[in-house]
Every structure is written in structure tokens, then in C-alpha cells.
Amino acid sequence: MKFKITLLLTLITNIIFAQVDVPAKYWIEDSNFEEKINAHHAFGDDDKLPIVVEFWASFNAANCFADWNKIENAVYYRVDISKAPNIKKEYRIRMAPTIILFKGGVKEDMWKAGLDLMLPTDLNEIQEAINEVNTASRF
């Protein structure tokens, strides 16, 4: 019984802090999604920063992308799929977490959780993809 209570408290804490650790300015929804993924320019159209969007769900908050604040040379956003049904449908989000890398509003790469609800990637792989997209856009 003590184990069950400890487990329940751990899960509740993870759910609460998984959403809280990402400030409100990084959360997007149906109404501002297109604007956000198309808005980040460094110096002009060729220098748009890539956008990393994590599709998140409270039921799987424990498996969220915890290293979001370590991403370099890109902008990060998080979408609560329960509050963004149109985006979820458009990008065929079936599992959370799912991460999509955009450049200039175009989907460049995608990582989806499997049936185990675990994200099959890490910060290094995502950063590598960001670096490749940034390098490719210079030519």
C-alpha cells in the first residue's frame, strides 16, 4: 500500500512539474501555431531559425522531452494535444510525445513515441538534425 501511494504521488508530481517547467511563452495552440512556426527570422528568409515543436499530453507527462532548454540554434515550442485538435489532426499526431522539426514552416524531421510511449530520440539526435538543417540552408 505504501508503495502504491508513493508511486501515485510521484506520478502526480511528474505531471504537475512537466507542464510547469516549460514557461507559458513556449506553449502554442491551434490559434497561433502557423504564426509561431513561420515567425522566427535571424536576418531574412534564408536565415530563419528552425523550430522544434513537442506535442505533449498530460497522461504521458513523465516521458516529455526534458532537455528542451538545452537546444541550440533553434526555437522550442510545446503543444498540449488536448488543446490543439486541429494541429494534432493535420500532423497526424497519434502518440505523445512527438517532436517535429520545422524550417521555414516546412516539416524537416519527426520523432514519435512508440507503443511504450517513450520518445525514441535524445537531445544529441535532435541537435544533430537541427545542425544539418541549419547547414543545408546556407547553400
Label each region the model flagged.
Residues 101-139:
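Non-catalytic, surface beta->alpha helical segment in thiol-disulfide oxidoreductase systems
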Residues 58-61, 83-86, 94, 106-108:
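Solvent-exposed loop/turn segments at secondary-structure junctions
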Residues 4-14:
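Sec-dependent N-terminal signal peptides
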Residues 26-72:
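Local sequence-structure signature of Cys/Sec-based thiol-disulfide redox active-site neighborhoods
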Residues 62-71, 76-88, 113, 127-130:
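ER-lumen resident redox/N-glycosylation machinery signature
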Residues 91-103:
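Structural micro-motif
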Residues 18-20:
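Boundary at the C-terminal end of the N-terminal hydrophobic targeting segment
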Residues 51-54, 78, 98, 110:
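Structural recognition of the beta-strand scaffold that forms the well-ordered cores
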